[in-house]
Amino acid sequence: FAIVKAQAGENWHEFVLWTIGQNFGGLENMSLIPGNVGTTPVQNIGAYGTEIKDTFVSCDAMTIATQEMKTFTKEDCHFGYRESIFKHEAKDQFIITSVVFKLTKRNHKINTSYGDISKELEKQNVTTPTLKDVSNAVIAIRQSKLPDPKELGNSGSFFKNPIVPKEQYEKAHALHPEMPHYVVSETEVKVPAGWLIEKAGFKGKRFGDAGIHKNQALVLVNYGNATGQEILAVSRDIQATILKEFGIAIEAEVNVI
């Protein structure tokens, strides 16, 4: 394994590309996620079947109140689906200064089973994908579905994919047989929030300068002058509609300040 320490201010995507260039595996499925390295443990960011917690070793953080340094291990961080201690007990108390990852140097576990990665690799005529091939596929998918925040205001995926009890999913599935899902455990199922939002008719809709992106229903966008309250109002309308139509509650993935 390779133990790699990255400073918090490093651009995340550039860091991922650097690890691939060194033939270090584990982060390639999270290519092109906007932001810096230091923010990744806060959200336990993830994409296409991979999360930060899969390769995370520890992070150093400065206590805001005392300027003392503290090291958080993986166990300390209480990672969950887009969750960590930094969103709850330790919220607004620390500034992460660096993050340590444990990456593979050989016998990489290439993960192409999630989302559209295998389809994209097939389109590119790749049969035995490398780390770089997976990264390129993820980049192509994200660029085709997600708007560039520099060109169209957005915060990426606005909602988490809900994880629901199997019985609850089966009730919703009986009414909507085409509803996709991913098995999380014997008792829980993950449902794509983007599918629910699109099925409810929100994809591509615009409410003044706030709206839902035409290519990816998980992304709320600001067409220019929408206020935070207007974006929030659209998100709550979506949540209420999904709950009413499918009996499934979807939570915001973003942090609302």
Q: In which residue ranges do the predicted regions lie?
A:
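Hydrophobic side chains in well-ordered alpha-helices
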Residues: 15, 231-234
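Phosphate/pyrophosphate- and phosphate-bearing ligand-binding catalytic cores of soluble enzymes
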Residues: 69-221, 225-229, 245-257
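Anion-binding (especially nucleotide phosphate/pyrophosphate-binding) glycine-rich loop
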Residues: 1-66
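Hydrophobic pocket-lining residues that define ligand/cofactor binding sites across diverse proteins
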Residues: 19, 242, 246
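Transmembrane alpha-helices
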Residues: 234, 240-241, 250-252
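Beta-rich strand-turn-strand
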Residues: 24, 228-231
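Generic structural marker for isolated residues within well-ordered, non-membrane alpha-helices
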Residues: 16, 193, 239
